[in-house]
A protein has these predicted regions:
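A glycine- and small-aliphatic-rich helix-loop capping segment at beta-alpha/alpha-beta transitions
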Residues: 113-121
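Catalytic cores of soluble, metal-dependent hydrolases
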Residues: 2-34, 40-99, 106-111, 131-220
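Acidic, His- and aromatic-enriched active-site or binding-groove loops in soluble protein domains
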Residues: 120-131
Length: 220
């Protein structure tokens, strides 16, 4: 009897790579499985897994890859941040763009520290809500924060508020940011793990795809 092996789920159906496979200007997407260190609420750590499960091969840049999940130590704060920062630095040192997916905003903090250490201490973190207020030059390198808590309640299975942004508004803002994005954190969503979470998971997947396309566009 022939045994059939299904393809391992990956972000956007992209190839799965190791660190040593990365090349300059490649977009590396990594899962961040930690949601108990900053602005915590349970379930955010499952976002990366859910996005992989619902992903299909899309017309996304071939210059992108799924790097797997970062090693995390959520019960040992100092060890955790040291490890995550080091792993982010290793990607950035290769000249690749890094996208962290899932978890709480502690991933963004670690990513910011890594960028400061590798690229420049003055690289700012820019959010969707403040990108038009900073008056940065178009050549300014930035870290983009995509906090999915900014989604309007109608797109979420467990809304915390009614007002907010639609998926198309978030994607439009991502596409129109004029600066050079070198790293991105997508976080803040605890998707339901059954059919109730299908809408919010698909919305997050579309936003991830927009981020990857925007990074690839900026590399050329």
């Amino acid at each position: 009897m022939q045994i059939r092996f299904d393809k391992i789920p990956s972000f956007l159906g992209l190839p799965i790579s190791d660190l040593e496979d990365l090349a300059p200007n490649q977009v590396a997407i990594a899962g961040y499985f930690c949601d108990n260190l900053d602005k915590t609420f349970a379930g955010q750590r499952y976002l990366a897994r859910q996005l992989r499960y619902v992903s299909r091969s899309k017309a996304v840049p071939l210059n992108a890859t799924d790097l797997g999940d970062l090693n995390v130590f959520p019960l040992e704060t100092e060890k955790h941040f040291s490890s995550v920062i080091s792993q982010c630095e290793a990607v950035l040192e290769l000249g690749a763009y890094l996208v962290l997916v899932g978890g709480d905003s502690s991933g963004l903090k670690a990513l910011g520290a890594a960028v400061q250490n590798v690229i420049n201490p003055d690289v700012p973190i820019v959010s969707l809500s403040n990108n038009n207020k900073l008056n940065l030059s178009k050549t300014q390198k930035i870290i983009l924060s995509v906090d999915l808590k900014e989604l309007a309640g109608k797109w979420l299975s467990k809304p915390r508020r009614l007002n907010g942004l639609s998926p198309s508004q978030i994607i439009s803002q991502i596409n129109n940011i004029p600066n050079k994005i070198i790293a991105v954190a997508i976080f803040g969503l605890a998707p339901e793990l059954d059919s109730r979470g299908s809408t919010e998971t698909q919305v997050a997947l579309n936003i991830l795809e927009a981020v990857v396309k925007r990074l690839d566009k900026g590399a050329h």
